[in-house]
């Protein structure tokens, strides 16, 4: 009888210990922070034609500025470069040399404190503006583009398209 | 403040191109002599149906690579995983893997997007 009680006790302790250890399993909570860049096109933009020889995305010229937004989830991980057009991607046969000018500016930020210097710190080379994205969050950029036909000659009638290139590059 | 956040949510990612991870890593593939990495491209641009993938060195010069698709159709609001294979001889030179939007439906002026992830030791 005593042996049986002892055996039951031992079994009970083992069972309790076993079940206790089962309840004490570590449950891992894992995370993989991979980071990403998102380029959103808020507005594609359109050219207005204030003069027969000029196409412009400036609202005062009847155009619409392309607006892009860039979201990054890691600080100091990306730079973003915008290149305004230096040629048409499609157009009728042109009758003179077309001169392109363009610019990119920060139009809004989601973090006014940490993104305040984005515009002043940008690097401009030709028609490419490069920004270091030093803070997480969203930045809105507006792009202007103007095409002027040589000799103030009127642009031939037809459809014209040009691209702004937005590049988000990990650093 | 809440109105601003709701505004952000409403306009957020209306027409977006996303790529992750920021810093992918190479692993040995099941094919001898090749390393492989995987990147994820999300298409939320209605005006884009195809994305091109590429591998580049530090000067953005192309590096030979193999992928099931280097130009791949990605439907609106869906993502695609790209497995990119590079010969081990080129691994040291491979610095960027990039996805580029292929614009097909542009009325007047459009935005072409390109996102590059970087291979680096963390």
Predicted features by range, described:
Chain A
Residues 4-13:
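Sec-dependent N-terminal signal peptides
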Residues 112-133:
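Extended, solvent-exposed segments with strong compositional bias
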């Amino acid at each position: 009888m005593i042996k049986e009680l002892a055996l039951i006790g031992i079994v009970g302790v083992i069972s309790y210990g076993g079940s206790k250890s089962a309840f004490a399993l570590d449950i891992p909570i894992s995370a993989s922070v991979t980071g990403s860049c998102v380029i959103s096109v808020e507005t594609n933009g359109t050219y207005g034609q204030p003069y027969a020889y000029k196409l412009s995305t400036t609202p005062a010229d009847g155009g619409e500025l392309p607006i892009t937004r860039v979201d990054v989830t890691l600080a100091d991980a990306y730079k973003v470069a915008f290149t305004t057009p230096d040629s048409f991607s499609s157009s009728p046969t042109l009758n003179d040399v077309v001169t392109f000018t363009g610019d990119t500016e920060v139009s809004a930020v989601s973090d006014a404190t940490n993104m305040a210097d984005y515009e002043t710190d940008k690097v401009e080379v030709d028609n490419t503006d490069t920004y270091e994205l030093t803070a997480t969050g969203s930045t809105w950029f507006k792009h202007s583009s103007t095409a002027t036909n040589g000799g103030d000659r009127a642009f031939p009638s037809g459809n014209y398209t040009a691209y702004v290139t937005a590049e988000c590059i990990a650093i | 403040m809440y109105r601003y956040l709701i505004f952000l949510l409403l306009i957020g990612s209306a027409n977006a191109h996303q790529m992750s991870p920021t810093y992918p890593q190479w692993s040995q593939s099941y094919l001898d002599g090749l390393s492989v990495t995987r990147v994820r491209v999300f298409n939320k641009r209605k005006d884009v149906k195809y994305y091109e993938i590429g591998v580049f060195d530090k000067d953005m010069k192309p590096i030979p690579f193999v992928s099931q698709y280097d130009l791949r159709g990605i439907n609106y609001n869906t993502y695609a995983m790209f497995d990119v294979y590079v010969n081990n001889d080129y691994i040291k030179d491979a610095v960027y893997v990039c996805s580029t939007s292929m614009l097909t439906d542009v009325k007047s002026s459009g935005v072409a997007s390109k996102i590059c992830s970087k291979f680096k030791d963390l």
